[in-house]
Design a protein with these regions (language model features):
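Bacterial N-terminal signal peptides that target proteins for export
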Residues: 1-9
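Mid-to-C-terminal alpha-helical segments outside catalytic/metal-binding sites
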Residues: 4, 19-29, 52-72, 243-244, ...
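Hydrophobic h-region of N-terminal signal peptides that target proteins for export
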Residues: 11-20
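Mid-domain alpha/beta scaffold segments of enzyme catalytic cores
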Residues: 21-155, 161, 209, 236, ...
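Active-site metal-binding loops of divalent metal-dependent hydrolases
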Residues: 31, 78, 188, 258-260
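Catalytic pocket-lining loop regions of alpha/beta-barrel enzymes
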Residues: 138-255, 284, 305
Length: 306
């Protein structure tokens, strides 16, 4: 086998499908780990939340990964603390085959003098794949903000956007102004489901964003899209938004993420996979391989596991 061919197979880690109903080896692109006792804490977790108000560490996640055929994981930082960028790298360093990379968080620092030195230091580790931006954006869309995004692209890193703080139209403008930057919107663009047809204005903004070729969409936190919990587990409740995402982004720009352990508030990991497969399996095994594996590797570009 040539060196180039070996590299490609190693990078994508493709697993042949023995039969039509088998999953490809999964790269789950949205898993959170946290130590609830760390000084910065996680302000979005309520004290009385019996599901999430505890630590979720690699040992908790690894058993789930083994059970469900997850060959790779992208860990997304759960909070906005700067030290947690390094903490996530450190806590997953023991198992680089599973923990392919880290998406940190620079929500409070991007566009300030503190961004560049810390970001460049983190980029010395090839498993640092980029960062997520969340929170309020209005005061941040400055020349310095865009300069930091261009530096991010120059370093070959990507940016996840948690919508809500950043509106879809803002991300569209960012994608236009920094076309070399790889952008991934989380959780189907932050759509909120209530059993009614999707709002026409939101659909228009979503489609406009999808026209930017450097923007990808994460099919993640499906159960969390519902305003009222527990969320329905019938695929019919999600077909409209999944049809929209598939038509808008196409088969090469959709990426799977579970949002574990936040999903535990509604359903277990098996239910997340079952729901996602219920929709995408009918599109054929080639599409499933892209959604669950190839697109993640192509977007995040994690180092080849050894």
């Amino acid at each position: 086998m040539s060196g180039i061919r070996a590299h490609i197979l190693g990078w994508f880690g493709l697993v042949a499908l023995a039969c039509a109903d088998e999953l490809p080896a999964i790269i789950d692109c949205h898993v959170h780990l946290w130590d609830i006792a760390r000084p910065a804490g996680l302000g979005w977790i309520k004290k009385d939340d019996k599901t999430l108000n505890r630590s979720f560490l690699p040992a908790d996640h690894e058993s789930i990964a083994r059970t469900h055929g997850v060959s790779g994981t992208i860990v997304v930082q759960a909070g906005q603390s700067l030290p947690d960028n390094q903490w996530n790298l450190d806590i997953t360093a023991h198992n680089p085959r599973l923990y392919r990379g880290i998406v940190g968080n620079f929500s409070e620092t991007i566009g300030t003098p503190a961004f560049q030195p810390l970001f460049e230091k983190l980029c010395e580790n090839p498993r640092y794949l980029g960062y997520r931006l969340s929170g309020r954006y209005q005061e941040k869309l400055t020349d310095a903000f865009f300069a930091d995004l261009r530096l991010t692209a120059q370093k070959g890193r990507a940016v996840d956007f948690l919508t809500g703080g950043y509106r879809l139209e803002d991300i569209t403008e960012i994608a236009r102004r920094v076309p070399e930057l790889r952008i991934l919107i989380n959780h189907l663009g932050g759509v909120k489901l209530d059993g009614k047809p999707l709002a026409a204005a939101w659909v228009e903004q979503f489609r406009a964003l999808a026209k930017q070729p450097n923007v990808h969409c994460k099919v993640s936190a499906l159960f969390g899209r519902w305003e009222k919990q527990p969320a329905p587990q019938d695929i019919a409740a999600y077909t409209e938004v999944l049809d929209l995402a598939s038509e808008s982004f196409g088969e090469d720009r959709l990426i799977f993420g579970s949002d574990w352990p936040v999903t535990e508030q509604t359903a277990d990991y098996a239910a997340v996979l079952r729901l996602t497969r219920a929709y995408f399996d009918r599109k054929g095994p080639a599409i499933s391989v892209k959604l669950f594996h190839q697109n993640a590797a192509a977007f995040y570009r994690p180092p080849v596991p050894k």
